[in-house]
């Protein structure tokens, strides 16, 4: 089996963190995608306590803080988190932003005896393919449910999985990773850095989060490679 550390998303983002923003900014479509997610989030989240899950370098903090949210910022990559901290310090905002540390940013550490936040959430944002870095969405669903109040809005953008296109382009990589125990996945490469990308279909995402979050809707964001999902926390308690 391939060395899993080699394809670890956290390690990948640590290594590319210094050029992440410039890479993202080089494609003007990314700002349009972020803007659409922003407007959708603001339209649907009425409470004031939110989680920016997998927040990267803090790009979404600008508008979250600007709209008066109390924000828990969760980013497991140290390199990305350090850049986000610099960006937070440069924000001219009175909004309360809680930067979660390395241990708290790992959702696998969350449980009933180790709640990473002080207030239950009204909204959760997971933007720009955060879920595609995570294999076990069922565990993530339970952990997010643990820290969410009833009717918390969970809004997430993930890679839109086009089976035909992916198989025609990445079939050999997909087969190799599947046989190595990664499940349905491909990989991306930036210089010498590689990262696993888990391919979650629309039906799988809806089914996986359905235990604790009711499905509201999903749609493709403009003509991009992203799909937006909207879920609503139900009453089911996490066992």
Regions found by a protein language model. Give the residues of each.
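Short alpha-helix
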Residues: 192-213
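Conserved class I S-adenosyl-L-methionine
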Residues: 1-45, 47-56, 59, 63, 155-181
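A short glycine-rich, Lys/Arg-flanked "PGG" loop and its adjoining helix->strand segment in the class I
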Residues: 138-153
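A short acidic, Gly/Pro-enriched loop at the edge of an enzyme's catalytic core
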Residues: 108-124
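A short SAM/SAH-binding and catalytic strip from SAM-dependent methyltransferases
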Residues: 122-137
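Class I SAM-dependent methyltransferase SAM/SAH-binding core
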Residues: 55-109
């Amino acid at each position: 089996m391939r060395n899993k550390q080699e394809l670890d998303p956290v390690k990948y983002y640590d290594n590319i963190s210094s050029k992440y923003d410039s890479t993202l900014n080089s494609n003007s479509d990314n700002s349009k995608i972020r803007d659409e997610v922003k407007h959708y989030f603001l339209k649907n989240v009425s409470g004031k306590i939110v989680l920016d899950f997998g927040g990267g370098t803090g790009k979404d903090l600008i508008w979250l803080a600007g709209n008066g949210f109390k924000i828990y910022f969760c980013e497991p990559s140290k390199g990305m988190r350090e850049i986000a901290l610099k960006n937070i310090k440069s924000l001219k905002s009175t909004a309360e932003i809680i930067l979660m540390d390395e241990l708290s940013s790992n959702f696998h550490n969350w449980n009933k005896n180790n709640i990473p936040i002080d207030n239950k959430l009204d909204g959760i944002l997971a933007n720009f393919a955060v879920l595609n870095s995570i294999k076990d969405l069922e565990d993530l669903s339970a952990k997010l449910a643990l820290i969410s109040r009833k009717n918390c809005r969970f809004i997430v953008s993930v890679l839109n999985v086009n089976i035909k296109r992916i198989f025609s382009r990445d079939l050999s990589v997909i087969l190799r990773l599947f046989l190595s125990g990664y499940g349905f996945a491909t990989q991306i490469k930036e210089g010498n850095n590689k990262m696993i990308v888990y391919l979650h279909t629309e039906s799988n995402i809806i089914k996986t989060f359905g235990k604790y979050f009711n499905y509201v809707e999903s749609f493709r964001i403009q003509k991009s490679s992203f799909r937006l999902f909207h879920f609503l926390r139900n009453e089911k308690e996490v066992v």
